[in-house]
Amino acid sequence: MNYQMITTNDELASLCEVTRDFPAIALDTEFVRTRTYYPQLGLIQMYDGKHVSLIDPLGITDWTPMRDLLLDTAVTKYLHAGSEDLEVFLNTFGIMPQPLIDTQILAAFSGRPLSWGFAAMVEEYTGLTLDKSESRTDWLARPLTERQLEYAAADVFYLLPIAGQLMKEAEASGWLSAALDECRMTQLRRQEVVDPKEAWRDISNAWQLRTRQLACLQLLADWRLRKARERDLAVNFVVREEHLWAVARYMPGSLGELDSIGLSGSEIRFHGKTLLALVAKAQALPEEALPEPLLNLMDMPGYRKAFKDIKALVQAVATESKLSAELLASRRQINQLLNWHWKLKPQNGMTEMMAGWRGELMADRLNTLLEGYPR
């Protein structure tokens, strides 16, 4: 497979200028994310229908032409299972490609599994079996091997022609508009940034804690997320989640107590004094400053029956629409709906099952069903 390497600012500028004459491109990224909070970009792959380009980001300092291309609405961008790629674009360039279409989403509206992999898609459409042995390689190491580069090039070379076929299938089935709506929703979901002050709500078993312990967890989770972003370190490499919960639960007053509840030596050495200061701050809060107790969704009266009834409604809609129930509503989305209905968690805007194409199919029936489950 022929491809060109792009390693300098001038080469990137020339490539982006030429590419903007094409109506559509296939995109992919390779990145590493083992200990870091943010994904570390290792390679960008691009195919315009004539040229496969592999862009090495390590030597490029001026990304303006790339940003301009990604925002050029005259050039459609196709990715496959692109949720993590979107995060890479957002963190590297501060933007989302526009317009963007995810071929995994297109395929789901044409009857394929929701998590249909790229290799399976290529095999169905071309009969070829791709070598995926390089998928876990270190994309930051240099030089990249010929095998790595061939693997990376294949990801976009086959994607673009298949994307065209999937667009035709989605249009023929009548679901193209819904598929594009789902692509937009995926982008919005990726752009949501967790407020450090709300990070405590995502800690497992937070609902088991009493109000002062919750106040402590709120302070601890806020600090940990800010520290992770500041140092570009995965949150569990700052302090492990179960250890953070234990600090909030037992509210220790000394380094020795931190050790006794299971914190690692490095956690105590680097962060012990900070953790103890946050515990002391939580201890000093007046009662009126403490958060309300957290209610666990699964402990709500009627949760299991409500979940079962929603699943049944989703299955009925799936049968009527000839879409998979998995595409219509995941467990996460059903739980999001019930959290929204019972007002257990703060939510930004309308819950996903009530919005967009899902809302058009299900909102009225869901509202009627939920009337039978008051808080």
Residue ranges of model-derived segments:
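Accessory DNA-binding and partner-docking regions appended to nucleic-acid-acting proteins
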Residues: E146, L166-R375
